[in-house]
């Protein structure tokens, strides 16, 4: 697994805990991604995208399967590269559930791509570092465009307030990307 320098220590530790060797390269997701592609090609490894891979999307879709018995009318899903949103939408759309994506203002590459603007963005700094994606995946872009009912843009101040309220009122320390849908 390749992660950029500066990746949160808890994420590195979490990946290593499950037996993966973590290599750090570059200062951004994109630099780490390019290095991972290069390693895969040079060593005949299978490259596995963090979000733009059918197996990853299917795995993340199991969250939608877990939600389905609770018969929600609407599910809001954080979007970075689109794997989670694609998987959850695939699992829930046949149940008649509205699926809405959520992105942070200035980190809204999927919302832009769905509207036809596929240019890379310079993602803003955000507490939701797990969704800082310059360009969403090709597969996930097609799935999100077809399956999502809407994408809402959340202001950083709203995200910050949500994280504080979760900590103070619920005694819950949440990752920024996870709290984005709240």
Question: Which residues make up each language-model segment?
Answer:
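PLP-dependent amino-acid enzyme catalytic core
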Residues: 1-182
């Amino acid at each position: 697994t390749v992660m950029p320098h500066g990746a949160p220590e808890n994420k590195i530790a979490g990946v290593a805990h499950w037996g993966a060797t973590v290599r750090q390269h570059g200062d951004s997701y994109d630099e780490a991604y390019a290095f991972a592609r290069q390693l895969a090609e040079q060593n005949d490894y299978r490259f596995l995208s963090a979000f733009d891979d059918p197996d990853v999307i299917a795995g993340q879709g199991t969250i939608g399967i877990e939600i389905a018995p609770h018969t929600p009318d609407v599910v809001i899903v954080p979007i970075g590269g689109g794997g989670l949103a694609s998987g959850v939408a695939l699992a829930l759309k046949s149940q008649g559930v509205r699926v809405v994506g959520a992105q942070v203002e200035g980190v809204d590459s999927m919302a832009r791509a769905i509207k036809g603007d596929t240019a890379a963005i310079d993602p803003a700094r955000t507490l939701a570092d797990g969704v800082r994606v310059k360009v969403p995946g090709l597969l996930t872009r097609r799935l999100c465009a077809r399956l999502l009912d809407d994408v809402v843009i959340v202001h950083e101040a709203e995200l910050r307030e949500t994280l504080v309220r979760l900590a103070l009122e619920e005694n819950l320390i949440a990752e920024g990307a996870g709290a984005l849908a709240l």
